[in-house]
Amino acid sequence: MEWDNGTGQALGLPPTTCVYRENFKQLLLPPVYSAVLAAGLPLNICVITQICTSRRALTRTAVYTLNLALADLLYACSLPLLIYNYAQGDHWPFGDFACRLVRFLFYANLHGSILFLTCISFQRYLGICHPLAPWHKRGGRRAAWLVCVAVWLAVTTQCLPTAIFAATGIQRNRTVCYDLSPPALATHYMPYGMALTVIGFLLPFAALLACYCLLACRLCRQDGPAEPVAQERRGKAARMAVVVAAAFAISFLPFHITKTAYLAVRSTPGVPCTVLEAFAAAYKGTRPFASANSVLDPILFYFTQKKFRRRPHELLQKLTAKWQRQGR
C-alpha cells in the first residue's frame, strides 16, 4: 500500500514518504479468493436451499445457520471484483461506491459470521445444559428470527463506518481501493478499528468460549452409562464445540491479532517504513483466513447436522437410480 501525498495534503495532514511493496498480494489473494468463490458460492447456496425446503422442521439453530449462509453468500458475490483488482496489481476500476460496498461486505460478513456462530453456540448450550427450562423455549422460531434481525442491525451499525472510511485513491498513476482507510486518516480510524475488534470479535468470542466451557463441564459431569440417544446428543455437542472453536481459531484470531497490531503501529508517529511494511504484510497476509469462513461455515453446517448430511446422499442415490433406469 502506498500513500499519495496529495491526498494527505488535501486533508491538511502531513505527507508520508513510505512506499509499501506488496507484490505478494497479486500472487496470494487472487487464487485464494477464487478458491473461496468456487467453493463458498455453491456450498452456501446448497445450505440455503436445504434449510428453506425444510421449513416445517426449522429449528432455532437452523434459522441462525440460514442467516449465516446468507451473509457468506453476499460476501462471495463481491469476490469477483477483488479477484480482478488484485490480479491487475491492485488496480481498482470499479469506482468509489463499489470500493466502499466491497469493504463493507467483507466486514459485515466477518462480524455477522462471528455473531451468528455465537448465537448457534448459545442455543447449543441452552439445549444441553438447560433442556427442560421453559424460559428459553418461549417464542420458538419467531424469537430466533427476532434475534437475527437484531444481529443484522448490530452488524450494519458496527460496519457502516467501514464504508465511510474506505475510499479510492491514486497511487503510481492508478486507482486503488483502500481497505481500512487512506493512510491520511489512520489516526482517525484507529479508535473505531479498536472498538470494532473489541465489540465485534472479543466480546462474542468470550461469550462463545464461556458457552462451550460450561457445556464441556456439564458433559463431563454426566457420568455412568447413557442411552444411545443421549450419547449421540453428547457426541454432537462435542463435535460442534470442537469445530466452532477451530473455525474461530483459523478464520478470526490471526486476522484480528495482525489487524490490531497494524492499526497500533501505523497510528504511531516516527515508526520506520520497513516496520510499517512488515506489519501491513502480516495483516494482509491473514486476510485469506478471514475470507475462508465463507467456506468453513457450510462445512460446519454439514458436519454437525446429521439429517442434512443424509439429504445429498439420498439425492445422489435417486439420481443414480434414475440414470440406471434410463440406461436400460
From Swiss-Prot:
Glycans are attached at N5. It comes from the Eukaryota. Disulfide bonds join C99-C177. GO terms for biological process: cellular response to prostaglandin E stimulus; cellular response to purine-containing compound; cellular response to pyrimidine ribonucleotide; G protein-coupled receptor signaling pathway; phagocytosis; phospholipase C-activating G protein-coupled receptor signaling pathway; positive regulation of ERK1 and ERK2 cascade; positive regulation of inositol trisphosphate biosynthetic process. Keywords: Cell membrane, Disulfide bond, G-protein coupled receptor, Glycoprotein, Membrane, Receptor, Transducer, Transmembrane, Transmembrane helix. Residues 49-62, 123-144, 216-236, 304-328 are cytoplasmic. Receptor for extracellular UDP > UTP > ATP. The activity of this receptor is mediated by G proteins which activate a phosphatidylinositol-calcium second messenger system. This is P2Y purinoceptor 6. It comes from Homo sapiens (Human).
